[in-house]
């Protein structure tokens, strides 16, 4: 019998998992083919989870285009590769895209990439459903509870936490961008960047979008409850003022005026492509610090310095969550490495640098 205890330093889905665009996809960006296949399989597992525990996922695909003609040509080649890899992807004329999303202008598009298998999820609701299912199977969920370190005694290993000492055989660090935690607990330095992802969530509005819209500079989708989710693609400007403001990785703006200014700026990007958003008001503006391993791939495996500590860090965390959960659990329980995860071990060479 396996006993599982889950701790969270604040509360579930309160950091990057809350402030994510939550696009489920196996897109052209998922390279090479083996990594793309991992994403494809995980998209399929999301369908299973939706049926098993009632995670509300809005399927319908994504529509994507770029501003420059050169980038559009490259997108056409990438979609051709996607088709060869088994994806339901195609290039549509704008008129056909308009039939799918009549409220989108498709400004600047000659044609549009349509990836029919994509979907989007409310990450907070998904996290709650997953934790409830885990608890129904006997898992303990404790928060707020921070991991301070590991104590090794004659009676075994114990997690030293702010909510007491917890005995363990194996511990999984699913800590996202908290690289200092990995360094202190796992005794490893994982080469990664971490940049802030800015997400605006609006007040509920009338049904406007059926699919994910990935337009130049901005991505947009609408949840079942009517809220529009908008993310900017370029990120914060590299100015001294912004660098100072982002020091310490804040999860919110220093004041409401600044937050509303940024929310409106991001909404204005979306309004260019969905004009009917003009009267919609922002409800939340979220800052999420994304874990970005330098080569663009997850970090999954035991620490070479602390054999009982397993690291599980991933960009594309939403898409990959179901398959990472399954495969990591299998490695932990069976105590044997799975070949499919060998490319993502913590001790690999992070040679290729991928910019997100």
Feature roles, as predicted:
Residues 165-210, 339:
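Central helical "cap/lid" subdomain
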Residues 8, 59, 92-94, 143-145, ...:
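Short loop/edge segments at beta-strand edges and connector loops
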Residues 123, 265-356:
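C-terminal catalytic lobe of FAD-dependent flavoproteins
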Residues 112-132, 176-178, 262-269, 313-314, ...:
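Mid-domain beta-loop-alpha active-site segment that forms a flexible
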Residues 206-306:
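Active-site lid/adjacent beta-loop-alpha segment flanking the redox-cofactor pocket in flavoenzymes
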Residues 22-100, 217-219, 250, 254-257, ...:
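Dinucleotide-binding Rossmann-like beta1-alpha1 core, especially the glycine-rich loop
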């Amino acid at each position: 019998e396996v006993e599982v205890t889950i701790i969270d330093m604040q509360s579930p889905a309160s950091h990057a998992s809350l402030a994510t665009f939550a696009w489920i996809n196996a897109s052209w960006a998922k390279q090479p083919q083996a990594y793309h296949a991992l994403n494809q399989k995980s998209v399929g597992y999301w369908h299973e989870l939706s049926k098993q525990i009632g995670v509300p996922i809005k399927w319908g695909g994504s529509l994507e285009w770029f501003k420059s003609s050169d980038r559009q040509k490259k997108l056409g080649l990438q979609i051709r590769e996607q088709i060869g890899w088994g994806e339901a992807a195609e290039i549509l004329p704008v008129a056909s895209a308009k039939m799918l999303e009549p409220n989108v202008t498709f400004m600047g598009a000659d044609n549009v990439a349509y990836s029919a298998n994509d979907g989007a999820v409310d990450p907070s609701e998904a996290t709650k459903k997953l934790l409830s299912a885990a608890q129904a199977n006997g898992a303990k969920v404790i928060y707020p509870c921070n991991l301070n370190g590991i104590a090794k005694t004659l009676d075994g290993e114990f997690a030293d936490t702010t909510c007491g000492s917890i005995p363990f055989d194996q511990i999984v660090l699913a800590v996202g961008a908290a690289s200092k935690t990995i360094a202190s607990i796992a005794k490893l330095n994982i080469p990664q960047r971490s940049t802030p992802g800015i997400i605006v969530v609006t007040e509920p509005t009338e049904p406007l979008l059926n699919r994910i819209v990935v337009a130049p500079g901005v991505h947009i989708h609408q949840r079942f409850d009517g809220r529009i989710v908008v993310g900017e693609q370029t990120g914060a400007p590299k100015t001294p003022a912004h660098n100072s403001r982002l020091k310490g990785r804040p999860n919110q703006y220093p004041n409401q005026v600044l937050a509303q200014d940024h929310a409106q700026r991001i909404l204005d990007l979306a309004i260019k492509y969905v004009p009917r958003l003009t009267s919609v008001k922002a409800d939340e503006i979220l800052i999420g610090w994304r874990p970005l391993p330098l080569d663009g791939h997850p970090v999954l495996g035991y620490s070479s310095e602390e054999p009982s500590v397993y690291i599980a860090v991933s960009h594309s965390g939403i898409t990959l969550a179901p398959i990472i959960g399954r495969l990591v659990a299998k490695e932990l329980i069976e105590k044997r490495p799975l070949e499919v995860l060998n490319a993502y071990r913590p001790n690999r060479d992070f040679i290729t640098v991928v910019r997100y």
